[in-house]
């Protein structure tokens, strides 16, 4: 239940500046314990989980809107569009702009 609650929180707040340390400590857990056990439950670290949610939502926005990549980065929770593009490329194998071109 604890990790389902965390996953739900991350899904609902993926576009905010989520600090794993603050999340864990506000629930009376050490950061290392939370990360280790979240990974056992989900198969991924909390930050990887959040990144995956953000990239999936960015992908949907690229498919369904004409928003600029910089705007999409901001919408899904990244202040730095370059960092967002690198993460997107790492997960999807192409840049956000290339992904959008492939859809046409």
Model-predicted segments: where are they?
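Short, small-residue-biased leader/transition segments that mark boundaries at the very start
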Residues: 1-2
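Terminal helix-turn-helix DNA-binding modules in bacterial transcription factors
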Residues: 7-8, 12, 16-21, 40-82, ...
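Charge-rich, low-complexity intrinsically disordered segments
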Residues: 23, 29-31, 35
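Core residues of bacterial helix-turn-helix
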Residues: 26-27, 76, 88
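Short linear Ser/Thr-Pro motifs
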Residues: 30-32, 65, 85
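Short hydrophobic/aromatic patch on the recognition helix
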Residues: 34, 38, 83-84, 88
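Short, contiguous hydrophobic alpha-helices characteristic of membrane insertion segments
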Residues: 87-90, 102
């Amino acid at each position: 239940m604890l990790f389902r609650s965390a996953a739900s929180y991350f899904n609902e707040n993926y576009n905010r500046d989520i600090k794993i340390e603050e999340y864990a400590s506000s629930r009376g857990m050490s950061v290392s314990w939370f990360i280790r056990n979240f990974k056992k439950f989900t198969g991924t670290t909390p930050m990887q989980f959040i990144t995956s949610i953000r990239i999936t939502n960015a992908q949907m926005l690229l498919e369904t809107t004409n928003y600029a990549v910089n705007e999409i980065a901001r919408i899904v929770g990244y202040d730095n569009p370059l960092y967002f593009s690198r993460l997107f490329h790492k997960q999807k194998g192409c840049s956000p702009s290339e992904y959008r071109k492939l859809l046409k």
